[in-house]
A protein has these predicted regions:
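Exposed aromatic-hydrophobic patches
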Residues: 251-253, 293-301
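Edge strands and adjacent loops of beta-rich recognition modules
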Residues: 223-249
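Short acidic/polar inter-strand loop motif in beta-rich domains
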Residues: 312-320
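Noncatalytic modules at the cell exterior or secretory-pathway interfaces
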Residues: 300-312
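Aromatic-lined ligand-binding clefts that engage carbohydrates, nucleic acids, or primary amines
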Residues: 257-279, 287-288, 308-309
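Carbohydrate-binding surfaces of carbohydrate-active enzymes
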Residues: 2-213, 223, 243
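A short acidic/small-residue loop/turn micro-motif
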Residues: 285-293
Length: 330
């Protein structure tokens, strides 16, 4: 839905986020400001590595095989598998029962290069001339069956599989691989490769010096709110009056000597229900807790009084968390 998370414009009177109380997009509640769906690129432009690379893998596969896939019929559908011609799409994520599920695409009876790929335990990634690149499926032995013969592949090595030339990349190696102008190139520094005009650019996020922030507690939180159910029978977000019961902190920092704040962020690691950050009394960022750090643009904070409010979370709140987050609050 969104490749890059975003932030809604500030409006003291009305939120642009979805809310159960509205007559339109009212399936759930969203924060007042943040509009981040854990997309490949986060709200402030940070790269979420897993969705970024796994989305890129399937986009590259569709670039090279999409025209063939488009002409194939849907053969079967089940809870975990979808078969379309020679492509099998697999997803074993089942909410609650198997939250750390996996997904992948493999070949089944695929005719190419004068041979038939009977099945694979590796994912197709891209084609470069007559060489087919695959990506390992972690936890599985990398094998390709061609014309009835099974070939066990060495990772990151080009080899023959019957009449076919193949190469199975390790998952980590694949994260550095980009097909540009018909060639497979590798990012040497763990960055992102792309073509800009007449050159290939590797963009790398470098670690900048950490600026320590001082956090001072101004007010302790009152008792956690009882989380009611909204119109759609899901947990309702807090109303403005609830934040009078939040824990309040001031945040101070020293950014002297820094002239550009575009790539400088405040990262807040907290546990609770909802967090809000104010600059000179104006709301600039908010967050429904999900176990991850909250990122705030320093450009919105510099030179202003910064205040953090955190609402505590009841352990029995009717909010859905995956098992990893549940363990953090129990």
């Amino acid at each position: 839905y969104m490749y890059h998370g975003g932030t809604n414009p500030y409006n003291p009177l009305h939120t642009m986020g979805e809310t159960q109380a509205s007559p339109g997009t009212n399936h759930n509640d969203l924060p007042h400001m943040t509009y981040d769906f854990q997309a490949p690129l986060g709200e402030v432009g940070q790269v979420f590595e897993t969705p970024f690379h796994e989305g890129r893998f399937i986009h590259q596969m569709l670039t090279d095989w999409g025209s063939e896939l488009l002409q194939m019929n849907v053969d079967s559908l089940s809870r975990h598998y979808a078969r379309r011609g020679a492509f099998e799409f697999y997803n074993d994520y089942v909410r609650i029962k198997n939250e750390s599920g996996t997904s992948h695409v493999t070949f089944k009876d695929y005719r190419t290069g004068g041979a038939t790929i009977d099945w694979t335990t590796v994912e197709p990634f891209c084609k470069v001339d007559d060489l087919i690149y695959f990506i390992e499926i972690r936890g599985k032995k990398p094998q390709i069956s061609v014309d009835g013969k099974v070939y066990t592949c060495k990772l990151n090595k080009q080899q023959k599989a019957g009449k076919l030339n193949v190469c199975v990349l390790s998952y980590e190696k694949a994260k550095t691989a980009y097909k540009i102008d018909g060639k497979l190139l590798y990012a040497k520094n763990g960055g992102i490769l792309y073509k800009s005009d007449s050159c290939i650019v590797e963009e790398v996020w470098t670690k900048s010096p950490v600026i320590a922030a001082t956090v001072t507690e101004v007010k302790k939180a009152d008792a956690p709110r009882v989380v009611p159910m909204g119109r759609q029978a899901v947990a309702a977000q807090p109303v403005e009056e609830d934040f009078a019961k939040a824990a309040v902190y001031t945040i101070n920092y020293d950014t002297s000597g820094i002239n550009n704040y575009d790539n400088l962020f405040l990262r807040i690691n907290y546990r609770g229900d909802v967090a809000r950050v104010y600059a000179d009394g104006r709301l600039v960022a908010d967050n429904f807790w999900n176990g991850k750090e909250m990122w705030v643009r320093m450009a919105d904070l510099v030179g202003k009084k910064v205040e953090l409010k955190i609402l505590p979370l009841r352990k029995d709140a009717p909010v859905y968390f995956q098992k990893e987050q549940k363990a953090m609050i129990e």
